[in-house]
Amino acid sequence: MMRTNVIRKVIGMVKGLLPFYLFVLLPLSAQAGDYNIVPLPQSIALQKGEPFTLDATVQILAPSALQQEAEFLQSCLRDMVGLDFPVVQKRAKKVRYIELAVSPKVTSKEGYVLTVGSKGVTLQGGSAAGVFYGIQTLRKSFANTSPASLLQMFQLPAAVITDTPRFSWRGMHLDCSRHFFSVEFVKKFIDLLALHNMNIFHWHITDDQGWRIEIKKWPKLMEVGSHRTGTIIGTNSDIDDQIPYGGYYTQAEAREIVAYAAARHITVVPEIDMPGHMLAALASYPELGCTGGPYQVGHYWGVYKDVLCVGNPKVYQFVEDVLTEIMDIFPSEVIHIGGDETPTEKWEACPKCQGIKEKQAHFTKRVFDFLTSKGRRALGWDEILDGSPQDAMIMSWRGTAPGAKAAEAGHDVIMAPTTHCYLDYQQVEDVLFEPSRCGGFIPIEKVYSLDPAPDSLSVEARQHILGTQANLWSEYMTNEAMVEYQALPRMTALAEVQWTMPERKNFDDFKQRLGEFTKYLEYLHYTYCKHLWPERQIPNRWQF
């Protein structure tokens, strides 16, 4: 045993020293990388001249205002090559730099210009966010190097890359109500967004099957609403496993996630889904419903008939209290208020709700006005479109038509149609060894084909299409690997929809670039569907 421990220590020392010998002591050859990355930049102009070689003499030059971005790049390179490239603020002679800067010459706030040459790399962004997206391009380009042996270094060809995103809203959604995921996994998921140049994390944290965020003024939401007595087994089943299930995020944990995302230029948009999808809240406080209960936290999937009572003044006090605490945690200008799948039967039979015309529109306006008074904007699913205030933002999920209608009416719109963007749907036709899933079949080609702002819209309407996102509803995603598997690589296809101009897109070319990118995903320990690469699959068994 002692001899084994000594051997392990020696191996550990060798691993620790290997990057140093690799970059400093050995006579090295070099392997050139490329810029065939995803999402594809808007312009890549290869230049004459020698490539840039990443060796131990390179330093990262950045002003104090970009210290966070410089340290992120340092961390990425450390993970890739095992060296800590120094971050400095002053230039020295005979040193090659990766230089980060914000420049007024880059007119797009999220845009950047990356200049690569033998003497160094210069990355100029329109803001710190633009610099950050340039760093993503840099790290993915280095990842494409794929050294053939330990005696090779990382190189990039001389080039000038000029880039800026097509859309300002580039998002991913994660449902943490149906199934609860750890803080560490949420952070890993946010890292995945950053890798894809995404800037919005839509966090679904309340629903019928569980209330997942601490609200101090209404403690039963955690004591009762965050736990259910069991969970339906399989798809289209009425069999309950009778195993208690629950969990919630403390406000401190939520703030930690918000800060983690902000460091990656990602805004966390929380969703408090109402007035439907509120059974967990009703189980906690039955007086908020039309019948007064009793209610039980949902344990099967689908739509429940019990909703918040729009004729009860206490409901609006509840909503304002919840949103006040939510706004204190989440600095996002946009707060998602749900509004989808709200049955009206209970309202129609409720004495308190009589006399209120257009009941859902009445509720939506009350919530909208409250958020507006606090300097925030309300975003809801496309059901809120009819009767909603002009400044309400619409998330179009029932196809693209509601989004087109909303945009033509002057609403700001995010396209997230089930036809293209519901990544909990199956992605391969042969489902024998696939996980359970909701809905139908959305192959990666379908995701890639989405145009959120087609020419069929008027010029004015296209200006109201802020962007697009994909949604991951977690009814059948019982663990973290399943979330990643359902997301990838379709999420990567959507990233190119969000970022790259349509005339630059080509699916066959994308598939070639995707093949290399997925190897980097493996290196970063993400699980993905390998159906496009049969040689990577293990036959006749689960693929994750």
Language model region names:
Residues K15-P27:
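Bacterial N-terminal signal peptides
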Residues V38-L40, L46-Q47, L54, E256, ...:
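Substrate-binding groove of N-acetylhexosamine-processing glycoside hydrolases
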Residues L83, M198, R264-I266, R376, ...:
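Short glycine/serine/threonine/alanine-rich loop segments
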Residues Q68-E69, F180-S182, D208-E214, P275-A281, ...:
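Flexible loop/turn segments at secondary-structure boundaries
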Residues M2-L18:
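Bacterial N-terminal signal peptides that target proteins for export
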Residues R170-H173, D238-I239, E341-Q354, P389:
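Short, conserved helix/loop micro-motifs enriched in His/Cys and acidic residues
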Residues T107-D306, V310-Q317, V322-V334, R366, ...:
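Feature activates predominantly on carbohydrate-active enzymes
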Residues A32-F167, M482, V497-H525, C529:
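Contiguous, structured surface segment used for ligand recognition
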